[in-house]
From Swiss-Prot:
Its EC number is 5.4.2.12. Pathway: Carbohydrate degradation; glycolysis; pyruvate from D-glyceraldehyde 3-phosphate: step 3/5. This is 2,3-bisphosphoglycerate-independent phosphoglycerate mutase. The keyword Transmembrane helix does not apply. GO terms for biological process: glucose catabolic process; glycolytic process. The keyword Metal-binding applies. One of its GO terms (molecular function) is manganese ion binding. Monomer. Catalyzes the interconversion of 2-phosphoglycerate and 3-phosphoglycerate. One of its GO terms (cellular component) is cytosol.
Amino acid sequence: MSPNTPLVLVILDGWGCGDRVEGNAIAQADTPNWNRYRSVWPRTVLKCSGEDVGLPPGQMGNSEVGHLNLGAGRIVYQDLTRITRAVRDGSFFENAVLRTSIEASRRNGHALHLMGLLSDGGVHSHISHLFALLELAGRLDQRSVYVHAFLDGRDVPPANALEYVEALEDKLKTLGYGAVASVIGRYYAMDRDRRWERTARAYRAMVYGEGLRASSARQAVEKGYERGETDEFIQPTVIVRDGRPVAQVRDGDALVFFNFRPDRARQITRSFTDAEFGGFERGPAPAFPDFVCLTQYDRTIVAPVAFGPQELTNTLGNVLSRHGLRQLRLAETEKYAHVTFFFNGGVEQRDPGEDRLLIPSPKVPTYDLKPEMSAREVTDAFLANIEKYDIIIMNYANPDMVGHTGDLSAAIKAVETVDECLGRVVEAVLARGGTVLVSGDHGNAEHMCDAEGCPLTAHTCNPVPLLIIGEAVAGRSLRPGSLQDVAPTILDLLGLPKPPEMTGTSLLS
């Protein structure tokens, strides 16, 4: 391949394969380009959940996991799997970083705070990891333990928080220590798009006790529902006892963030760890607790990490760079980390010959208000740069991000926008004799309501499609596979040898 005959990988985020038409934004959308490509060019389906991508059996995939496996060309055992195994085999309770922090807080008379997403969605966190931390605190005789519960509503049903709150309260009652100190929708606590005003509200609730008030976590959720908020959007609420906050994060306290996925953990982490911080005004007495990251959120975050990163070598980006190929990574803000950091195996540093282009996502509260997102701008940027690169890896965020809103009509519009943009990409590549691979990373937009018609905002375990478009594959057939097989297929198309670390195999028959 050369810039005159480029190879392009287009990742359709959240575009899964579903049999039902009801609640299926992809099936209901008008997609003339997609339909034509499927009828003409080689296609197959790829497994993208559970053990096929390094997750526990039956666990739905997600964008982070999908891009890791796509770029690595092998099954990458995910942090969820690693940490859950550590809990089961007991090594979690011997983790030196966790023990050091908890023991120091007890020894110095300070509290232990545990913050993170209260959910079993398995995308950003798992409630079982929180329970393990609570048990570890007891083993180390730390009884001043406070939970700051971020509510999900995206990776699990949108109004399911009471189930998790009840499970947490039952656990605390069984243990005989600990309390919930705040309840905050992930919209505020886990923003990743530099909407610092959201992060600020979460921070001030935890540090200053500012925000709405409730006498219990259950009441905080119920009051949110009364205001018409689903779990994700429940406003930061401080739990009070006798009119005073149950607990606030103070200097010298220990604060363990039990989310394992980095992208939505970084902003709130930096508000606690960065000495020089410009995201928002932290107030007259910012807290600098003994902060622990469950996994590495960013190499530049100065805080100990309980479960360090896996080192992945010979990823697709490494191989392309070593063979002197110029590559572009292109996405809008919401998925930029996925085509860069995650696709490169959890490494921020770019390879020689790798350029990156970030297109800002629109500034709207939720993407059902603008289902087109920045797809057309991403496409314009692609067309402006197609002559410069041998390989372009790009992402369309719409099916996933709009799918998460649960608004079927908006998701249909999102899918139609992507189909329009995909047509422009394919036309430009074919005009230059190149090849386009179109792949999903996980399901979402193909299953947006349950049998009763209630909205579903979470990912699915459905497989995703893979199409290969170009004269180089005319008349060829593709075998079924999984996401790990995409990178070896790209190397096969380029005539490059597959490194031994890649356990996936080419899908070309």
